[in-house]
Amino acid sequence: GVSPEKGIITAVVAGFVVSLLGGSRVQIGGPTGAFIVIVYGVVQQYGETGLLVATFMAGVLLVAMGLFKLGAVIRFIPYPVVVGFTAGIALTIFTTQIADLFGMNFGGEPVPGDFIGKWMLYFRHFGSVNWANLAVGMGSILLIVLTPRFSRRIPGSLVAIVVLTAGVWALRTYAGMEGVDTIGDRFTIRAELPAAAMPAMDWEVMRSLFPVALTIALLGAIESLLSATVADGVTGDRHDSNTELMAQGAANR
């Protein structure tokens, strides 16, 4: 629901803060698909200012959770919840990317924020599939999957970006192919940083956004601490849950 440069700037700043102050030595903070539905709904109803207010409030709640030592609660979450949580995130990301993978054209019809609504929209507009777009997307997936079989030093995602970007550029330049959109075709990414400013705090808006802020805080806490727990199992380290929560809160503020 927001422009790409906002996501890039947020990822860099928040990732730096979480890595600097976080309670896990190997965890890196960044954007996640679990928040897509929530963020989209907030932007649609309250605009970007509402999203800023909700995120700021969520940051305050996360810091408070860390100060009150609520990070230890992660120990009581059943393991099947961890598995279901991870699978749910994967399914959410998959669902949100279907339209772009298939190059669908919805004719100006807004994309619903809920899971079922998205799939109903996809089925209604399946006839608008852009096959050239789908071919490039499937090529990316194949390169990412197959590259590790030949070289584990070079990331498959990097190979896919380089090879297919060059291929699409060559086809557009020398063969006149226009079926595949680039990021530049869809968005205008400005190079300058936006001026930092506090959002307008309206008490009525804050009260209506509190449930959303609480959801963001709880989801962020659970996802961050579950990821840290999984990382502990791989590295043998032990993270500090409360420090991690406060770092996540500072990054959101």
Regions found by a protein language model. Name each.
Residues 1-253:
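Transmembrane helical cores of multi-pass ion-transport proteins
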